[in-house]
Amino acid sequence: MSTNPIQPLLDVLYQGKSLNREQTAELFGALIRGEMSEAAMAGMLVALKMRGETIDEISGAADAMRAAAKPFPCPERNNNPLHNGIVDIVGTGGDGFNTINISTTAAFVAAAAGAKVAKHGNRSVSSKSGSSDLLAQFGIDLTMSPETASRCLDALNLCFLFAPHYHGGVKHAVPVRQALKTRTLFNVLGPLINPARPEFMLLGVYSPELVLPIAKVLKALGTKRAMVVHGSGLDEVALHGNTQVAELKDGDIVEYQLTPADLGVPLAQITDLEGGEPAQNALITEAILKGRGTEAHANAVAINAGCALYVCGIADSVKAGTLLALATIQSGKAFELLSQLAKVSGEALVNGQEKGR
């Protein structure tokens, strides 16, 4: 008889049965603490994938990772009803398209328009340049201390939280994930485990089949309001086609589609949004944020920032949010914000505030 406390839970999975939320949290807790062998880890991830993860299982895995994350000292939530929480603009990645850094650029625009944005991100998954790769080009310290990040959020309306800096236990799964060479539950967990615990989310997923399930997971995790989107192949709101949406609001989930016309912008081609290496994408982002980007680039960023502004209550519709985002882009305020964030990040390093992080 096995003395391994997690073996009975693994056996349930091997029988093709589901675990409840608490059981899944127990399994992933063991993984994060380094108490699970690579063989067991692979067996667990494959068993979940082959059957299809339930809402409870995804929520339980997120619970475990949230509980184990490095704490983030959130600044006091503003009592102003238009600024009553934090928003994240995030995607699962893995959509297979090499686009410009839309969600990261949109985060600067939304913050410059008044939203409190805590952007949780990582290095590239499917593109040549992930959010962290882009920010590094601007001299923004990816591993700034939680205290420095919190000060940035409070003073600048924006901070960037580098996932590996807050979720150290995930390192135990890296060899297995690399060896499996297939998507697993980890591919959808990233956006769900932001240590700032945002009340509002614009969350893009790589598959249309994930839109409704992930909205249900966000509801289970206590998210106040969210839009989960898949845009014609992209893990974000699409400029080149329809976007499938599951909107969580007041405890209810409503499904619908958005077109570029609904957002007040013209249709573009996916090729208009093709990105490159981090250095090239940084130049594109700089041009957009200075109000000098191409129409397609500006619109792609604006519709995503606009949906985030709608989700967090600053705009009363996605179209109004998009218009506000476009005006913010033209003002150049978003680039000023990027420059300020890079300056604060650099000063913290020079002053030694990042020691012991």
Curated annotation (Swiss-Prot):
Binds 2 magnesium ions per monomer. Anthranilate 2 binds at R177. Mg(2+) 2 binds at D235, E236. GO terms for molecular function: anthranilate phosphoribosyltransferase activity; magnesium ion binding. InterPro entries: Anthranilate_Pribosyl_Tfrase, Glycosyl_Trfase_fam3, Glycosyl_Trfase_fam3_N_dom, Glycosyl_Trfase_fam3_N_dom_sf, Nuc_phospho_transferase. Its cofactor is Mg(2+). GO terms for cellular component: cytosol. Pfam families: Glycos_trans_3N (PF02885), Glycos_transf_3 (PF00591). It catalyses: N-(5-phospho-beta-D-ribosyl)anthranilate + diphosphate = 5-phospho-alpha-D-ribose 1-diphosphate + anthranilate. Mg(2+) 1 binds at S103, E236. Catalyzes the transfer of the phosphoribosyl group of 5-phosphorylribose-1-pyrophosphate (PRPP) to anthranilate to yield N-(5'-phosphoribosyl)-anthranilate (PRA). GO terms for biological process: L-tryptophan biosynthetic process. Anthranilate 1 binds at G91, N122. Keywords: Amino-acid biosynthesis, Aromatic amino acid biosynthesis, Glycosyltransferase, Magnesium, Metal-binding, Transferase, Tryptophan biosynthesis. Its EC number is 2.4.2.18. The lineage of its organism: Bacteria, Pseudomonadati, Pseudomonadota, Gammaproteobacteria, Alteromonadales. This is Anthranilate phosphoribosyltransferase. HAMAP family: TrpD.
